[in-house]
Amino acid sequence: MNIRPLHDRVIVKRSEVESKSAGGIVLTGSAAEQSSRGEVLAVGNGRILENGSVMALDVKVGDIVIFNEGYGVKKEKIDGEEVLILSESDLMAVVG
C-alpha cells in the first residue's frame, strides 16, 4: 500500500466481523455490525507540539487497535482496499 499519513494520523484496515448471530442466523445490511477493531497499516511521524518538537505515536504498524469511529474519521479506498484515516486520539486501545 503506497500511502504515508501525516503528523498524528494513522491508517487502519478494519477487521472482518462474524456475520452470523449466536443462533446461526446470517446477518445482512444494518443488522451486520461493523467492527471497531483493525490493524494499523501506516503511521505518521508524530504529533507536533506547541514548542515545535515532535512527539512520536504510541502505535506502530501491525498493532491491532480498537478505535472510535466518529467525526474526523475518513474512509478511503487505497489500492482497491477500504481503509480508515484517523488521528491517534481516535484510538482507544491496543489489543494484545
From Swiss-Prot:
Domain of life: Bacteria
Any one Gene Ontology cellular component term annotated for this protein: cytoplasm
Keywords linked to the UniProt accession: Chaperone, Cytoplasm
Cross-referenced InterPro entries: Chaperonin_GroES (IPR020818), Chaperonin_GroES_sf (IPR037124), Chaprnonin_Cpn10_CS (IPR018369), GroES-like_sf (IPR011032)
Record's subcellular location: Cytoplasm
MF terms (GO), sorted A to Z: ATP binding; metal ion binding; protein folding chaperone; protein-folding chaperone binding; unfolded protein binding
Main localization (coarse): cytoplasm
PROSITE patterns: CHAPERONINS_CPN10
GO biological process, one term: chaperone cofactor-dependent protein refolding
Record's keyword annotation contains Methyltransferase: no
Subunit structure and binding partners: Heptamer of 7 subunits arranged in a ring. Interacts with the chaperonin GroEL.
Role, per record: Together with the chaperonin GroEL, plays an essential role in assisting protein folding. The GroEL-GroES system forms a nano-cage that allows encapsulation of the non-native substrate proteins and provides a physical environment optimized to promote and accelerate protein folding. GroES binds to the apical surface of the GroEL ring, thereby capping the opening of the GroEL channel.
Family statement: Belongs to the GroES chaperonin family.
Listed name of the protein: Co-chaperonin GroES
Source species of the chain: Shewanella piezotolerans (strain WP3 / JCM 13877)
Taxonomic path: Bacteria, Pseudomonadati, Pseudomonadota, Gammaproteobacteria, Alteromonadales
Gene: groES
